[in-house]
Amino acid sequence: MRQDAVEEIGMVEAGAIINLPVYAFKIPAGFPSPADDYLECRIDLNEELIEHPHSTFILNVSGDSMIGAGIMPGGKLVVDKSIEPSHGKIVIAVIDGQLTVKRLYKRRGVIKLMPENPKYSPLIVKQEQDLLIWGVVTNVINPLY
């Protein structure tokens, strides 16, 4: 059974800083209001989403095994390979040649790759299986459509 897949690896490349405005108020979901009077600052999404540019890459998500963690089909994962893949982190793993995104469980010598959707079972990593952790997911970018 294919649990979940990630596709299209893309390296983050250093480029021009793109500062986006951040407004100092919470947006009401009702009547629109003029916003420019409330401009607080500008942010660069590179700074907000990427701590280690030379060890960060982006993956596109397919499948629904991680929807409970806010990782939706069609979303993009920001992955940092310099972060230690510890218990509880969401990781990009290759198990027996298959790429997946799951929450890492490491306790008392047991390693599991845990989905965040009750439709799927945990992947218990057996000693004879090959497991490689590519990196830790640091951010998720999901479409709203």
Residue ranges and their predicted role:
Residues 22, 106-145:
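Glycine- and charge-enriched low-complexity intrinsically disordered segments
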Residues 68-72:
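A short glycine-leucine-enriched loop at secondary-structure breakpoints
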Residues 87-101, 105-111:
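Short, compositionally biased
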Residues 78-79, 92:
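Hydrophobic beta-strand signal
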Residues 74-75, 89:
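Structural motif
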Residues 1-67, 99, 139-145:
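Short, positionally conserved secondary-structure boundary motifs
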Residues 73, 95-100, 131-132:
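Short coil-to-beta-strand transition motifs
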